[in-house]
């Protein structure tokens, strides 16, 4: 049963006052070019180019060309480019990708006097009736699942996915009254601005942290109250390195039976969490703030914060001696471990040994107290970054909720 004031359409239930239009009715297809990355530069030129790879991984639903650094076409290749220069309100769709993200699009604004063309593996589109759409509406709607899910039956290819102009011609676009489009676009722009500003702040905090690490972990900057000479020392003077136990996969489960296992991949994500009901020795129990290091692939240390767990094979734990603040070691080891990883032979998977850790050379302060003071400063910055990241996740979820309500007309702003 459709609620009063709404109607059933080809793309689901929409408000009575919303129209629908097919892709073919909506757009004129513009020419694109086939220039590769090698034929572009960021130094300057006459004509700029929108590359499909940037649409897929970098550009938002609405691309402000006045603020985004677009690449230029190399001077010797300008003649190869199409002369289909873009205008504000044009939509660029990526027609090729490695998965179902194919079809991701961006609406361009802020072009001004710039000469900008659409590049390789794109479908540049111009609304036939520019007055039908408020700025940014198409950018937001075309990227929402109500539209994008219509592309899925038309995706072809196995290793590389693609869609064609002809195949998507019958896909359907919702057209609210223009004042409502404007109100929806404004609301989504506001949340996008908040998200972008948070991302910039996180980047700034990370840069501050990086600078602080370079100063504090080398002794170039000393904290008040500390003096004495820093010296290089092998880590075996400061830590023992415990390697995890080879728990039997016969006891592995994903239904929380027993204790969680810490496997190599768990240091980076929670995509696949396993538990084990196997009896264990307490020496392999991991607690929050333990410093763990993956021994296959990425060697970067992890400050464990996911509760009581069991240390599985090919994951190691730093066991500090009395003269070491283990949190300082977490920060101090990041650079030498990265260098060790990058210097490892080009095998399919890189491996770290128990001896590799103990032989690492680290510049150490003369006292444990100075180690702790440095670690506290860096930990505070990490906490700030973590809180900002949590806020970012929250606002991204808010945006998803707004889109699901506003782009379907379930909530009306006008």
What label would you give each PLM region?
Residues 1-17, 170, 175-229, 364-414:
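Amphipathic alpha-helical coiled-coil/heptad-repeat segments
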Residues 3-7, 16, 36-37, 44, ...:
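A short glycine-rich beta-alpha junction/loop motif
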Residues 3-34, 140, 170, 178, ...:
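Non-catalytic DNA-recognition/assembly elements of restriction-modification systems
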Residues 8, 36, 79-80, 157, ...:
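Short, solvent-exposed loop/turn positions at domain surfaces
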Residues 51-53, 62, 68-143, 263-265, ...:
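A short beta-sheet element
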């Amino acid at each position: 049963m459709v609620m009063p004031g709404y109607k059933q359409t080809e793309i689901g239930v929409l408000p009575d006052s919303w129209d629908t239009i097919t892709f073919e009715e909506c757009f004129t297809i513009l020419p694109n070019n086939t220039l590769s990355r090698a034929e572009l530069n960021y130094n300057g030129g006459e004509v700029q180019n929108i590359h499909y790879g940037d649409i897929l991984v970098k550009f938002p639903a609405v691309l402000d060309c006045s603020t985004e650094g677009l690449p230029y076409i190399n001077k010797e290749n300008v003649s190869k480019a199409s002369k289909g220069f873009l205008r504000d309100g044009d939509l660029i769709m990526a027609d090729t990708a490695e998965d179902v993200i194919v079809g991701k699009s961006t609406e361009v604004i802020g072009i001004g006097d710039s000469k900008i063309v659409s590049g390789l593996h794109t479908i540049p589109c111009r609304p036939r009736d520019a007055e039908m759409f408020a700025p940014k509406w198409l950018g937001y709607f075309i990227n929402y699942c109500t539209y994008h899910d219509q592309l899925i039956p038309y995706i072809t290819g196995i290793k590389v996915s693609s869609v064609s102009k002809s195949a998507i011609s019958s896909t359907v676009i919702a057209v609210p009254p223009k004042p409502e489009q404007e109100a929806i676009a404004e609301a989504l722009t506001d949340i996008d601005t908040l998200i972008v500003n948070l991302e910039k702040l996180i980047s700034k905090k990370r840069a501050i942290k990086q600078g602080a690490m370079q100063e504090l972990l080398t002794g170039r900057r000393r904290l008040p109250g500390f003096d004495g000479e820093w010296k290089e020392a092998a880590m075996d003077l400061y830590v023992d390195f415990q390697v995890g136990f080879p728990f039997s996969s016969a006891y592995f489960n994903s239904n929380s039976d027993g204790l969680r296992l810490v496997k190599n991949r768990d240091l980076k994500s929670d995509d696949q969490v396993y538990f084990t009901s196997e009896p264990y020795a307490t020496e392999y129990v991991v607690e929050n703030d333990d410093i763990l290091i993956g021994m296959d692939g990425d060697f970067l240390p992890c400050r464990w914060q996911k509760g009581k767990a069991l240390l599985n094979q090919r994951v190691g734990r730093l066991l500090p001696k009395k003269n070491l603040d283990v949190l300082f070691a977490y920060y101090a080891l990041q650079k030498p471990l990265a260098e060790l990883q990058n210097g490892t032979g080009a095998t399919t998977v890189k491996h770290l040994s128990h001896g590799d850790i103990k032989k690492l050379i680290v510049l150490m302060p003369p006292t444990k107290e100075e180690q702790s003071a440095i670690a506290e400063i860096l930990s505070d910055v990490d906490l700030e970054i973590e809180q900002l990241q949590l806020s970012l996740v929250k606002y991204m979820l808010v945006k998803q909720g707004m889109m699901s309500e506003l782009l379907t007309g379930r909530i009306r702003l006008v």
